[in-house]
Amino acid sequence: LYETTNKYFSFTFNKVKHFADCRKIVYFQSSGRNVRIATTHGNLLCYDKLSKIIKELPPNLFVQLHKSYIVNISFIVEYSANEVVMSDGVHIPISYSRKEDVHNFLRLNY
């Protein structure tokens, strides 16, 4: 269902195939199997697990901060030990179990 070709993330929702430019995806937020894709042009919806989605995204552009969030590091405007702030003002927590990996990733890629 998911693929990234030429930096596009594709997914099927309600039997319709959608394409989202990875460079315009701000973050993914899951609630159960519902995943909201926040983009610079509004929100999209798909059904899946973040653990599957993260494998399909450009690895140097996206990082999973929490069991419920994957973020595009291009849209992080500030980060601290416990959270990041996205360009749209949303504060996203960094889980304790991912904290060290996230900070190492951000040091290398941000």
Write out the residue ranges for each language-model feature:
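Conserved binding/recognition cores within well-folded domains
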Residues: 1-87, 91-94
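C-terminal output/interaction extensions
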Residues: 101-110
